[in-house]
């Protein structure tokens, strides 16, 4: 599906100056969800991306794999950047549904916010690490 490849290229080159082109790739009522956001509509999605660029420097989004089944694409990716002076990398997967017109109508990002984000925060991270150790199988190293 050429639309999936085009959206992939758009995401891999996403930058503040490319946000005006978002409407070429998503429907006006697009539904976007990730561990921090659940928004509907082009303007709401644009604000999510604007907020990301306001908060994160040196953003890099790389798609490692793209699979298609009809109107649904599954994308494995890596997102990296610098937040408050600290470099980070997130590994995740997206489920993307395309409308009959070939634009994205749903984009759901899945990634482990507990181990890839929250555990790096001073107070919450210690608490999550403690809880994880308490409920983990005793055979884990």
Where are each of the predicted segments found?
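Generic detector of well-ordered alpha-helical segments enriched in charged/polar residues
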Residues: 8, 23, 46, 125-132
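Short acidic-aromatic low-complexity motifs
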Residues: 1-28
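Bulky hydrophobic/aromatic packing residues
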Residues: 21-26, 36, 77, 109-111
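Short, mixed-charge, low-aromatic patches
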Residues: 1-9, 32-35, 49-53, 138-140
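Soluble or luminal CAZymes and related metallo-dependent hydrolases
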Residues: 2, 6, 44, 88
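A solvent-exposed, acidic/Ser-Thr-rich amphipathic alpha-helical stretch
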Residues: 19-20, 27-72
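A beta-strand edge to alpha-helix "cap/lid" segment located at domain peripheries
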Residues: 54-60, 68-141
